[in-house]
Amino acid sequence: SNERDLFSLIDYFPNDTYVVSLRAPIKLFNDSYAWYDIYVEGNNKFYDHEAAAHVRDKLYQFIDDLSKNQNINAENITLIGFSQGAILSHAISFSYPEKIKNIMALSGVVDEKIMKKTSLIPKTNIYISHGTNDNLIDYETSKKSLNFYKGNDIDFKFESFEQGHGMNQQNLESMMRWLKEKI
């Protein structure tokens, strides 16, 4: 995916929403980018957790700088992440719980290995969706990763949709209804 994908959704956001969409630094192919490298050996996929944690911190610093230097309500920041962006959104909200109000994590997983250890439990509103036919990030793996939130008594909304590694109209409408209730 790339940074332009979010702008195709702009009409669904409330008029006073300040939208920032970032391009990940690693070019994969055509118009697709990644935040960190993914390695595949047989049926196993893995990535460098240290590199992902470094990206997490850089993204947080960008968010912090942006909220200080622009006319943005620093207490009403929502992260929307797809795939790696979803993984990073989970990590940012738990690593910096005082900064993020909402996350919308689409087709990703919760990975504790890239979360900073903190004693604060985030008050972040969390929306998670995943396609039941996702062949890139397994649906069942995504559901199992939610045990992290359940184990820490953190409330979240999870929805599944009959789709692959993407977002369909039903998913879009549902997540935007959720967001409008939260902002």
Protein language model regions, located:
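Serine-hydrolase catalytic machinery in alpha/beta-hydrolase-like enzymes
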Residues: 1-72, 76
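Active-site signature of alpha/beta-hydrolase-fold catalytic machinery across serine-
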Residues: 8, 91-95
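Flexible "cap/lid" loop of the alpha/beta hydrolase fold
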Residues: 31-39, 108-126
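Gly/Ala-rich beta-loop-alpha elbow adjacent to hydrolase catalytic centers
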Residues: 81-85, 89
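A conserved short beta-strand
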Residues: 98-110
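Short beta-strand/loop motif that positions the catalytic acidic residue
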Residues: 128-130, 134
